[in-house]
Amino acid sequence: MDFVRKYFFVSIALGCTAIFLMLISCSKKSADPDTVITPAKTTTPPVTTTPVMVTLAGNGVNLQLSYYSGGNADLGFTLMKQQSKIKTVRIEIEPNQVNNAIRWIKEASDNGYTIICTYHKAAVLGSDQLQDLLDGANWWKTNYAALSASGKFYINLMNEWGSHSLSAANYAGYYNQAIAIVRTVYKGIIIIDIPGYGQETYVATNAVLGVSTGGVKITDTDIALSTHIYPGNYVGQHVNATGSFASGGNMVKADLDYLATSGRTCLVGEFGNGTNGTADWSGLVDYAKSKSWTILGWSWAGDGGDNIHPPMNMISPNFQAYKAGSIYPYTTSSYFEVVYNKL
């Protein structure tokens, strides 16, 4: 801002000159409404492809409890507390497990962990159907109050909704509807899994930016985008912000770079080594970590294996029945270091 300085030279011999200077000085400060005053220049920041990324939470692990002992399982927190790198737990909840999940969340909260809870319906993984996503949103609307009474957590709206062929326009439009429902009960960051089982980084990014969507984009800005990383990761859609198109292939670091251009917090909601495929899952996880993204290993326990690869469980045996007042003596498994060394 410029400041007008007035200099007054009082002299009888130069009286006329002094009056002249005073008149000029007053005219520069005039508050006359007809005077055009140029305000301080404000500019809209340009869209950037290198946004400042925010770390959502500390690194940690996934727990899939719904399928063991009817969900009434011992979570193994006594052993977990001995693993100092584990700061966050992501808990997958099948729709019928609300009562058990209340205890899961309370135990995680009592043990001091940051908690992410995700609606997980195994029967519709990879679905492109709007109704499946809305079912998840309405489940949160119905159950958030009861669940959150046991402890604070981030909502991961739905686990792995959306196939590899889902369009960015539908991903954006459908999530706008689902997010609006969740917002009636929850005001925090909503984590949304990117489509293609957590692999289609371009689709999710374009849905946020409104690229190749006919103008549709995800309107809620308080969201985080979650990718899942395994050897089988495949990115089939590569339409970027300039309209360039590339063929599909294994997920590579550039795919994570493009996800970062969304301008939203990003995280690795799951990672592990136990699937078919040749993607460099280890290098990708390390790269995401170098970007300060939260990384969450699959899994503490609850993985059932696929009859080809051994279960990706960090503890042994798999989840056992919960007994009040009793602690099951889990031990770490041979898989433990695969995840833990990355955290």
What spans do the regions from the language model cover?
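Bacterial Sec-dependent N-terminal signal peptides
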Residues: 19-50
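Extracellular glycoside hydrolase catalytic/binding regions
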Residues: 58-65, 70, 78, 134, ...
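An active-site-proximal structural segment forming one wall of the substrate-binding cleft
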Residues: 72-86, 93-120, 125-157, 169-183
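N-terminal amphipathic alpha-helix/helix-capping segment at the start of soluble metabolic enzymes
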Residues: 53-55
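The conserved SAM/SAH-binding core of class I Rossmann-like methyltransferase domains
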Residues: 91, 117-118, 269, 298
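Short, surface-exposed connector motifs at secondary-structure boundaries
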Residues: 84-88, 264-267
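Sec-dependent bacterial lipoprotein signal peptides
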Residues: 1-25
